[in-house]
Amino acid sequence: MKVRVTVMLKDGVLDPPGKAIGHALHTLGFANVGDVRAGRVIELELDETDPARAKAQADEMGRRLLANLVIESFTAEVLS
């Protein structure tokens, strides 16, 4: 079963990559772009058939390793 964990910096935490991407987009002529936040997407293939258990495992992975909960938040979703 495939799961996706998306990790983002919490609101209020400085995001230098997001600022750089936003600046580059403005330089390329995309003047209508506002704030940009950059994050990470981790897709995992789990040997699991129960979607609820796969989601629970992805949540635990996010809490224990994939996200720094002091400055980041995460979401986990089952894809298939």
Residue ranges, per PLM feature:
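Short, intrinsically disordered low-complexity segments
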Residues: 37-56
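Short glycine-/aliphatic-rich beta-strand segments at the starts of folded cytosolic domains
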Residues: 1-11, 40-44
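Conserved functional loop/turn residues at catalytic and ligand-binding sites
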Residues: 29, 45, 69
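Solvent-exposed beta-strand sheet faces enriched in polar/charged residues
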Residues: 6, 36, 45, 77-79
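Short amphipathic alpha-helix segments
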Residues: 12-28
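C-terminal structural segments of small proteins and small subunits
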Residues: 52-80
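Short, charge-rich, low-complexity interaction segments located
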Residues: 23, 31, 50-54
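N-terminal glycine-rich anion-binding loops that anchor highly charged ligand groups
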Residues: 30-37
